[in-house]
Swiss-Prot record:
Organism: Danio rerio
Any GO BP: regulation of dopaminergic neuron differentiation
GO cellular component, one term: extracellular space
Keyword Signal belongs to the record: yes
Family: Belongs to the TGF-beta family. GDNF subfamily.
Glycosylation sites: 150, 186
UniProt name for this protein: Glial cell line-derived neurotrophic factor
Cross-referenced CDD domains: TGF_beta_GDNF
GO MF, one example: glial cell-derived neurotrophic factor receptor binding
Summary of the function given for this chain in its UniProt record: Neurotrophic factor that enhances survival and morphological differentiation of dopaminergic neurons and increases their high-affinity dopamine uptake. Acts by binding to its coreceptor, GFRA1, leading to autophosphorylation and activation of the RET receptor.
Keyword field: Cleavage on pair of basic residues, Disulfide bond, Glycoprotein, Growth factor, Secreted, Signal
Basic residues bias locations: 119-128
Amino acid sequence: MKLWDILATCLLLLSSVSTRPLFHKLQPSKRAVVRSESPALDPIIDSQPETSNPKQASMEEQYDLTGLYPEQFEDVMDFIEATLGRLRRSSDVEPQMKRDRVRQKAAANTEKSGGRGRGERKRSRGRARSRDDRVKGQGRGCLLKEIHLNVTDLDLGYRTKEELIFRYCSGPCHDAETNYDKILNNLTHNKKLDKDTPSRTCCRPIAFDDDISFLDDSLEYHTLKKHSAKKCACV
């Protein structure tokens, strides 16, 4: 569309130049010749109406104008050729710019896809490590487990339909036993110690969940403290 707009502008300039009156460019010498020759005409001819003189003058002026057109045509043609040259150069540059933009977009998309791929691989490796940790943790002994219960199931004397997640510690602590624990266990097994000897190392909570409050069937509020384990260890 840009090329056609410029060509239409050039054609309008050309048509305006071809139809524009150029009386102000007439050569004064030719006008002087016409005036100097007019008194020498025959009286009979002078007696004729002067209506034919304007026609003759207009024909002469038109004849003179045709001599001036080539210069203006050359100017217009030079302008058109220069405009077409610029359009050719711009048409050669625009495809190259488009190709460069396409390459840049392709490179950006490749980098984005590569970044997403690396992120997904990192996340998959992280999930695999977490699964391995869970599998290994199952064999480490003392673990934190959970169960969904009703508050009434806790047998603390509350009658309510409120529910909670109860977390507890479970598992052996053989790996956490010290020589003291082993000696104590051996002496107890050989009945060389009294029955009131402290128990062995066991899996117990070392941190508890936040307190919870609930409304029982009698519309009374109650609060449970240190009711659920948050972190476990062999103690």
